[in-house]
Amino acid sequence: MKKTKIYLSLILLALLVYYCSTVPITGRKQISLIPASEINALSFQQYGEFLKQSKLSEDKEAVGMVKRVGVNIQKAVESYFSQNNMMNQLQGYEWEFNLVESDEVNAWCMPGGKVVVYTGILPLTKDETGLAVVMGHEIAHAIAQHGAERMSQGLLQQLGGMALSVALQNEPEATRNIFLAAYGVGTTVGVMLPFSRTHESEADRLGLIFMAMAGYNPEAAVDFWTRMSKAGGAKPPEWLSTHPSDETRIADIKKYLPEALGYYKK
């Protein structure tokens, strides 16, 4: 049993070391067990299915704004990566920007550069700069490979559960089940959700820089998230949420602004 525990621990350690990458700008180390090519292929498939089930907006002005902001931020991202000799990280990207008809207040960017904005968020973005806040944030999630990291965390969580199960194999059945249940809750609250909040904060920071490089004033982010805060309903406590609280997010954005403003050219 002891040898098995050591063996599993070594496997997990090897995975963490070998499949470790670095997030641009923040320098945070992240685990990435799944090749970008596989992530992108899955992303493109899901994106195609989503479009088949959705209605694209016919508002030419709004559609034009979404595509314009998207292309501007795309160029900013490519410029940053080119200047830092990191263009290989954008290999396989097939950028696309669409506006879909939906009352949902939402937007997202799938790995590989597939961006969708919902018409329901436009009243809150108000203008092109507000939209750049949202699109910069969502594109930053993809650029930082947060989706791949989340999937990798899920795989590690499964491996960790297997390791604990082996370690407790000599314990009574009831005791083992209790431990495994506790492990599941502990992993979700203690590890998985905090990473989600880290992703959100990281996307805020990168998004501010990308929108600034694209020519949009990053100071508009404070106003946008203030509007989002007022529009939101009851929220769970921050420690059980995948997003930072509104107060935390706005405070963090204010801390990130001096850095982002260094990239801003009117």
Please tell me what each predicted stretch does.
Residues K2-L8, L15-K266:
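A Zn2+-metalloprotease active-site environment signal
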